[in-house]
A protein has these predicted regions:
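Short hydrophobic alpha-helices and adjacent helix-cap/hinge residues
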Residues: 3-13, 27-330
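Bacterial N-terminal signal peptides
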Residues: 12-24
Length: 330
């Protein structure tokens, strides 16, 4: 059962939008075509895609009406990142929309020298990943989007509130994902400041996640995972190990809390997608992507899963439950 303090607020807001929204914004100029490239299937990225489509629709671009969406999913296969992007370029789509870091990098490379904008989303560190040169002014680059950069130190402080005695914190990530390398660097910085040792385990595919989790058994007091697409895809295997050995598992996105991690300060990835859809609509309407600043997710909230905590052998303090935006109880 999900108990959400802002559920009724969202329902009310949606009702207002449906009544007040002018539906003529995207009607001029005939049918537009966008290519959506998603790096892999997992709930957070699926929610992002749904948010994109909704954000476009609410701004006048309706899939199947005045908008054609070519959706492609590489399912984590790096060999497909570039070929999907190149196919979009060959087909002459109006915009390429990319969900996650590796395929965003491929799309930027494929679209270079063309007039096709690339709008990325769910990318943690777009500057470090080479997708844009900076957050604000990137007029030589026909690229913009929405970052899901989180404050890792907030998650570490949350872990110490729930587990005051934590001394060793494990993390699992794919070293081939630049977003994950960035987050692990931030994790080490945050833990160093609090005297916590970070124990790292790396994976190449989601099939490696269970083995990596097993390698941390007996070595750490808890595990934290960032928004690593490889690990999140194999999350159930990690949760299974953590439940079997009573290793508390913390995450960085709400969908991982829904699936059975304990707590996170995170974005709602549907909202990240919706925010991206609004930007895509603006670019379709004539705004210049190269003059559009990269945005960050607008709302970070605390989500906890009390049942997951019990299965992993700990109890979340009432003070944390009371301030959580969303509490999952099963």
């Amino acid at each position: 059962m999900k108990i959400s303090k802002n559920l009724m607020m969202r329902i009310g807001l949606c009702a207002v939008i449906l009544v007040a929204l002018p539906m003529t914004i995207g009607c001029a100029g005939g049918t537009k075509t966008i290519g959506i490239s998603q790096v892999v299937t997992h709930p957070a990225l699926d929610a992002t895609r749904a948010g994109i489509i909704a954000g476009l629709a609410d701004n006048g671009y309706v899939d199947g009406d005045n908008l054609m969406v070519d959706y492609q999913n590489s399912e984590g296969d790096p060999s497909l990142f570039a070929s999907i992007a190149q196919q979009f370029v060959t087909n002459g789509v109006d915009i390429i929309v990319t969900i996650a870091t590796p395929n965003s990098q491929a799309a930027v490379a494929a679209a270079e020298g063309t007039d096709i904008p690339v709008i990325f989303t769910a990318v943690t560190d777009p500057v470090g990943a080479g997708i844009v040169s900076n957050w604000e002014s990137h007029e030589d680059e026909n690229v913009t989007g929405v970052s899901d950069m989180i404050v890792v130190s907030d998650d570490v402080e949350l872990i110490t509130e729930i587990m005051p005695g934590v001394k060793k914190l494990g993390t699992i990530y794919n070293a081939g994902e630049s977003n994950s390398v960035f987050l692990v660097e931030k994790l080490n910085e945050a833990c160093d400041a609090l005297g916590i040792e970070v124990v790292e385990a790396t994976v190449s595919t989601s099939a490696d996640v269970a083995t990596a989790a097993q390698s941390l058994v007996g070595q750490v007091d808890a595990i934290w995972i960032g928004t690593d697409n490889t690990v999140v895809t194999g999350l159930e295997a990690l949760i299974g190990v953590c439940e079997d050995y009573h290793i508390p598992l913390f995450a960085a996105d709400e969908d991982s809390i829904v699936r059975g991690s304990i707590a996170a300060y995170s974005f709602d990835y549907y909202d990240i997608g919706y925010q991206t859809g609004e930007i895509v609509a603006e670019i379709l309407g004539g705004k210049d992507a190269s003059k559009t600043a990269v945005e960050k997710g607008k709302v970070i909230s605390l989500s906890v899963n009390t049942a997951a905590a019990q299965r992993m052998g700990i109890t979340i303090p009432d003070s944390i439950i009371d301030r959580a935006e969303t509490v999952y109880t099963e």
